[in-house]
């Protein structure tokens, strides 16, 4: 039985990956640092198949032992806040330490790292810089590394629409950060999890970068219009200049429960679409599902 370690497995994407990979019969180990329900994770597979456990850091003897015996390591772990520690520490240094442990594992077949679209171009964001540094380090230090750069991931329970929909339900006026012209190319979570399944099942070798996006490119204004249309509610979109938005979000970040932070706000400043230079779903014969249909289904539910 192939053994897979998934960092960040307790999150939205992680649970979908666990559910799909468990159906393939793999043993799945889910290390976690933040409080999570181990019982709910175990229920994603058959008895004894999913093994969640708490670890403080990568110096933990148990995690080191597991990492030296696993066949596949998937890292979804990331950070959106640098309040307590820098992005370089939480993202790059974590991946650096992780790879240095994995290099001692002769059984390891693949390292799969979840990145994001445009991290190689966004020099303003310290988070993007840390992620891109991690990409380069992983690719340079392991011969079978697969980097996945997904668009904004949609599906039941996703973080993006889960944040937007409550605002649309209660407010007639919807803030539109910037001019609303920046574009995004969302992708369905089932397509992303299928991509990972095929990478693992096919024992894909070599270094690869996949840009995982859906077929539809939308501006944020177009997306907002679709949401209001599918909700059957008339909404007025109020452009909010980025300077003002940053000032307001900066103030909100002082409080513990800010709905959005400056790093997340930066996504609205640039296009978040495929560059046509890396591999995509077609490489593994996957046809991504229509993103507008996914938005409609999520809104209607």
What are these regions (language model features)?
Residues 82, 117-129, 153-158:
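Conserved catalytic-site region of short-chain dehydrogenase/reductase
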